[in-house]
Amino acid sequence: MLEKLNNINFNNISNNLNLGIEVGREIQNASWIKSPFFSITGTGADRGVRLFSVASQQPFRPRIKAQLSGSGVSGNTDFEANYDNLEILSQTIYPDAFGNSLRSKIKAYSELERIDFIKESVDSLTTWMNEERDKRIVASLTNDFTNYLYTQTMNVATIRKAIFHARNGLKGDNSKAFPIKPIRATMQSVGNVMVQNTSYIILLDSYQANQLKADSEFKELRKLYAFAGEDKGMLYSGLLGVIDNCPVIDAGVWNKFNVGMPNSSISDSDFMRYLNKANVSSIVTPRQFKEKLNQEKDEKKRSINKEISIGCLIGASAVLLAGSKETRFYIDETVDAGRKSLVGVDCLLGVSKARYQSTDGVVTPYDNQDYAVIGLVSDME
């Protein structure tokens, strides 16, 4: 992923700004390739993680149009008898600068060691940038759900219910919401008929993934995959399977060394570190979410005694990411009176779960609601 860096002469990099720009670009590209969100990220409205380019830390306001809901007119009725409303929805994202740096040992040890330090630092900073950004995406996705489903054990039925709710605009209590747009639709020819292929992405943590594998209905699905010869393809692509045309992914478990999906055993501070308070209306950590679930269960004379695992269904524009086009790469060889080198990277980044508000004060179904996320919650076992 960083193969192009092998052709760069690092001896003169501190005196060549163009080399620094090239290294920064390679770091940014490589950090995305390592990301599980890479395949669903882009600038289009049909991407799961939607990118916006910003040049400064000024607040950025992405906008969308709400679906027209009027009944129109018919016959000889004048237009003015029933005007529709073009609702523009927006939210504010506050980009922030984030970066990291490393300092070398004294240069007197060897010039070769200095060059190796720069190369190794580039690789380590790439991995750091990837994990830092991905944890911000995951934290934004799983913070303060407005729509979620809880089950003791993750299974095919719960995932199918989430997909049904997403397609038909329902909440966990079956109240009306709005349909979630699927991620990038493709046209597929079936015989002489063109069929639109749409899908949501299901992200589960490893505990939920193992629960799903133990589900008898999922085992039957796996037999169908094997019969169709698709099981090996899914194995090598990292997919658990496909349910109702929606890929199901084992995204791993959040911990200090891994991005993964969060659970209620992680500390509040570890989760909150990846949320910019300016970009959220409220913070509900996984621990607090478990307490919220317990309060709801208490009303039904039940309680959740175990930790909870948190996954989610995501649709188009679930997460909005406003950032600078390029990652800046720095080398300072004047540290400690010129005895040491400092290597660093930084960029602008604002991450927020899509949650829009009407711009003209008219209340819409979208106001303060997760635009394209449904939480999938189960006991952590």
From Swiss-Prot:
Covalent S-S links between cysteines: none
InterPro entries membership: ORF017-like (IPR025267)
Protein name in UniProt: Major structural protein ORF14
Record keywords: Coiled coil
Keyword Coiled coil included in the entry's annotation: yes
Protein's organism: Helicobacter pylori bacteriophage KHP30
Coiled-coil ranges per UniProt: 287-307
